[in-house]
């Protein structure tokens, strides 16, 4: 199942829905069966947006790529809206994604991104110059942060970045593709979690310097 639902624990017992509303369910690595169809029907009856995905492995890889920016937003203390608006932050995230695109090409792994753009097209879009205004007013109730940011902010002591950026690093090592930025994001975010360092210890420049 690929989960495309954003949520934030704003305080104990309160979960805020911060974006996305889709579950994609399929058999691994492709196809579907009675269980998949039955689960999707149950989800639809509960007013959840869900669908059967015949190529769920490709969708899971696409979700992993989306999650590569989580460590960056956590270390720099940026919301999704803030990072998406600033060309400096978009450029960093584009470079992180380009490392991943090179690795996936070398490994001959097919992926499917959310939306109509391919991964390479999304990277080109991130590199477009200028500030991007946020769609609508960004307030405390609409501002969204990834799960990794929440892990650091709540001092949970662990993060998932080794499953995200770490996967790209290990694939890069296997196929001889450099992944300097993904490596530094993984390593520094793991250190921040272990040391209970709150979000905001890094910026784009310090991360690039650490990757040299």
Question: Locations of the language-model features?
Answer:
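Residue-level recognition of alpha-helical structural elements
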Residues: 32-35, 85, 89, 157, ...
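Short, basic, helix/turn surface patches
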Residues: 26-31, 77-86, 206-211
């Amino acid at each position: 199942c690929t989960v495309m639902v954003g949520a934030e624990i704003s305080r104990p017992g309160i979960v805020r829905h911060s974006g996305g509303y889709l579950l994609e369910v399929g058999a691994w690595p492709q196809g579907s069966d009675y269980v998949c169809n039955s689960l999707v029907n149950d989800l639809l009856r509960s007013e959840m947006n869900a669908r059967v995905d015949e190529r769920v492995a490709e969708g899971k890889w696409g979700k992993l790529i989306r999650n590569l920016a989580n460590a960056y937003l956590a270390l720099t203390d940026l919301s999704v809206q803030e990072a998406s608006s600033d060309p400096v932050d978009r450029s960093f995230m584009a470079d992180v994604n380009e490392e991943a695109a090179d690795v996936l090409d070398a490994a001959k792994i097919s992926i499917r991104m959310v939306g109509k753009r391919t991964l390479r097209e999304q990277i080109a879009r991130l590199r477009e110059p200028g500030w991007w205004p946020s769609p609508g007013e960004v307030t405390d109730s609409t501002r969204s942060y990834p799960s990794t940011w929440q892990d650091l902010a709540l001092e949970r002591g662990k993060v998932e970045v080794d499953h995200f950026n770490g996967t790209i690093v290990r694939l890069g090592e296997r196929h001889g593709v450099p992944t300097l930025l993904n490596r530094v994001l993984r390593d520094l975010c793991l250190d921040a979690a272990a040391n209970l360092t709150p979000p905001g210890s890094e910026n784009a420049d310090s991360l690039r310097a650490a990757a040299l």
